Amino acid sequence: LANGDEVDPDGHVLNSLIETVMRLQREFANLKYAFLTVHKARSFGSGSERLYVTNKEVKNFEPLGEICSQAGGRIPSPQLENQNKAFASVLERHNKAAYLVVGDSANFTNWAAGEPNEADGTCVKADTHGSWHSASCDENLLVVCEFYFIL
C-alpha cells in the first residue's frame, strides 16, 4: 500500500493516513497549548509552579499518599515560601489544616514557635496561615495533594 502498488494504485490509503497524522498533530498542539495556558493561569495567582488541590475530604495521614498518588500528585512538600503560601491559601479557603511532608534536607521551613515538638506527634500539619506544627498522624485533616508540572 505504501508504495502505491496494485492494492491502492492511486495512494488513497497513504494519503488518508498522512491527513490523519497531520490532523492529530494539530489537535495535540492545541491540547498542549490549552493545558499550558490553564496551568500558567492557575499558578499565576500563587506565584508557584506547584498546584495544591483538595477533594474536600478529611482523612488521617495513612491513606494520604495513596490518595494523592492515584490522583497523579503527592503529599504536599512546599520547598519555597511562595509554594507554602499557595498551599496555605487552600487551607485558608477551607478553614482547615492539612498534612505535609518535610524533607530531611529542606532548605525552607515554616515551623510555628516552639515547633517541631515530637511530643505532639510524628506527622506535620500546616494551619490556615501556613505555619507548620507537629501533629498526631491519626488526626483527620483536609486532604490536599500537590501537583508539579515541569514546563
From Swiss-Prot:
Gene Ontology cellular-component annotations: extracellular region
Thylakoid as UniProt keyword: no
Paired cysteines (S-S): C68-C145, C123-C137
One Pfam entry name: Lectin_C
Signal sequence, start to end: 1-4
Chief location bin: secreted
InterPro entries linked to this entry: C-type_lectin-like, C-type_lectin-like/link_sf, C-type_lectin_CS, CTDL_fold
Alphabetical UniProt keywords: Calcium, Disulfide bond, Glycoprotein, Lectin, Phospholipase A2 inhibitor, Secreted, Signal
Tissue: Expressed by the liver.
C-type lectin domain sequence ranges: 31-146
Glycosylation sites: N107
Subcellular location: Secreted
Molecular function as annotated in GO: carbohydrate binding; phospholipase A2 inhibitor activity
Subunit-structure text: Oligomer.
Function (record text): Inhibits enzymatic, anticoagulant, edema formation, myotoxicity activities induced by snakes phospholipase A2. Is oligomeric, but it is probable that each of its subunits can bind and inactive a PLA2 molecule.
Family assignment from sequence similarity: Belongs to the alpha-type phospholipase A2 inhibitor family.
Name of protein: Phospholipase A2 inhibitor BjussuMIP
Organism field: Bothrops jararacussu (Jararacussu)
